[in-house]
Amino acid sequence: MLDLAGGTTVYLACGATDLRKSYHGLAAIIKLKFKLDPYSRCMFAFCNRRRTSIKILQWDGSGFWILMKRLDRDSFHWPDTPDELQKVTLKEMHWFCDGLSLTPKGAFEECHPKIVV
């Protein structure tokens, strides 16, 4: 069964992915490009070039699930960096699906001071 438990690890395949790919094509990207096990219980999310569709792949122990969301208007705030995998929480994935960004503009950036006065 599809696992939507709060502790589920979600990986975002940053950049654009050809969403015409199905189970085997997406699993191959996970295995060959990102060197991860597509048969883990993790969720792997992919976005198209126009950022109007997201496809999520998850193995449940007996088969793959594919979930897909396509927007009628607007676009997802998907990370740009190609060839990178970003680990997010399930809650953050819900934010993406609701149109929010993980890096909202105007938020303070974390700093790491090197000198203590």
What residue spans do the PLM features occupy?
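Polybasic/polar functional segments that serve as interface/processing modules
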Residues: 1-117
